[in-house]
């Protein structure tokens, strides 16, 4: 559910507040692209990729109206117990993406149930509009450079291979999103339809803490 502007904002905040070596991150650009990667083949953010893969597969999520990715399963499969030197920045970024989706999607499911709103098209539209507004409250400053290292790490992504042509499409899509988001940046807090500023603040803080603790633990093992 979070768009790439929200994923980028969490990644940028983490990189502002922590040193990359303490997080185990070696290439910032590759890590940033990893934060977009699970959406690449779903087709929503980058419609012109070579082929499509289902959200449930790329995000390790069961089919549901608001799916919640299993980020711990991804960690256990591709990070835990591995030689840190063999865990790429793309993999770390992809894990961060799943944390973000799981945090916001899970919180949204709970919130909707608590206030007694029934799932449906009207609820979906209200929810999507709120997330679109929330994403525009962030001003984004980092771009993903298209480098041989990025192409190589994507080709070696352990969950499924990423074609070079699709990496290029993804980088271009990220640039377009960043430019558009900054052009339409909201300096003042927006008025939401379904969710609330407190919902986004609390959920964002929880996501940040999971990201920080997980990557600090990885970075300590990598030292």
Please report, for each region that a protein language model flagged, where it lies by residue.
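N-terminal leader/auxiliary helical segments
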Residues: 1-223
